[in-house]
Amino acid sequence: MAGPKFCGKTTTCMLYQKSFVKLNTQQAISMARMNPKAVLNGEKPRLIDEWQKAPDVWNQVKDDLDFNYEFGKYILTGSSTPADKTTVHHSGVGRIASIKMRPMSLWESQESKGSVSLSALFDGKEDEFPWDMNQDFSLEDVAYLLCRGGWPISVRAPRDIALEVTKNYWNGLFVFEDCENERFRNKKPEVLRMIVRSYARHISTEAAASTIIADVRQSNERTMDAKTFADYMEALNDLYILEDMRAWNPNIRSKTSIRSTPTRHFVDTSIACRALGVSPKDLMGDLESFGLFFEDMAVRDLRIYTESLGGEVLHYRDNAGLECDAVLHLDDGRWGAVEIKLGGDDNIEAGASTLKQLKSKIEEKSDENAPSFLLVLTAVGGAYRREDGVFVAPINLLKP
């Protein structure tokens, strides 16, 4: 199980283990490196926390499963990749399944009523779609949730100190003095923060790497070449805090070219907020930026829900100017299209129009199935089905 620090990996996995070892002290790490096979000893399921600090543990697990295969025998957790990836001699395919854990969605933090089910939409259960005015949820609530994030300790904290908890997470994110991983120790924290800030300024856009590099140079009055940027980006990706969204290519039979540039996203929007020093009040004063930050939070929740159904979230954009914020594509071929808006009749109408254009183009010029549903996902407002068949629902009613 991989994911960013502070998202609850160890706490969750402790619920499923019958014995465990934590590689969180220098003594434990040294012993595991000297005798990685011994780390496997213990009642199964055996939890090995922060396995990447003794990477040969992975090889020992794989070898053990080659000769003594059982389902659910080991649980490995990690908040970064190994310092030296060459020490992992096998991908684990066919032996070890990888699970990505993110901070909590609103459904998981019990801040979504869950009356709108993506599973039901995929199954065509239109009669289960609610009509709900949803009057007790405001933009101010969304701004707060966005800045707080889905970090379990922040979620549990009283509202008046939850933002401070998230701030403390950001302040400690790039403290590597005691880190045994040279890849992180050799990075300058201030440069990592610069890149994350530039990334945050381009949140929910398809900004090219060259654009982000130029932003770093201009905003901080310093030089940065593409090689240095790529090196620092690898470190940020290894910390699981960035999560770009790749493009959907439905193989359209026309001269239309599908754009392949990924959309820039974070594993949790609160990281972007803290990087830029953005508060709930700031968001309320800049609705254009608020919309981009909200799109990022919505993508976080859609990813969590869609992956639990056996699928992934992609984006669509072609050279004809047609763009869709999120395409929810299941492994069985079913898909649904989602436009993400803060709310308001004009925005909802624009989102519905985009969705219907995409549906028409796919049905006319692609071998893809027709979409299971079209959904305008809003920050606030009610849930209902429009006369044209497009569903409208706020994020605080959504669940898998």
What are these regions (language model features)?
Residues T86-T205:
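Interdomain motor-coupling "hinge/lid" segment immediately C-terminal to the ATP-binding subdomain
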Residues V155, R159-R334:
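Accessory nucleic acid-recognition modules appended to NTPase machines
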Residues K9:
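Conserved lysine of the Walker
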Residues R33-I75:
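Conserved nucleotide-sensing/catalytic segment adjacent to the nucleotide-binding pocket
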Residues N24, G336-D346:
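Active-site ExK catalytic segment of metal-dependent nucleases
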Residues F67-V88, L236:
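Sensor-1/coupling segment of RecA-like P-loop NTPase cores
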Residues T12:
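Hydrophobic positions on the alpha1 helix immediately C-terminal to the Walker A/P-loop
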Residues K125, L377-P400:
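Domain-level recognition of nuclease-like catalytic cores that cleave nucleotide substrates
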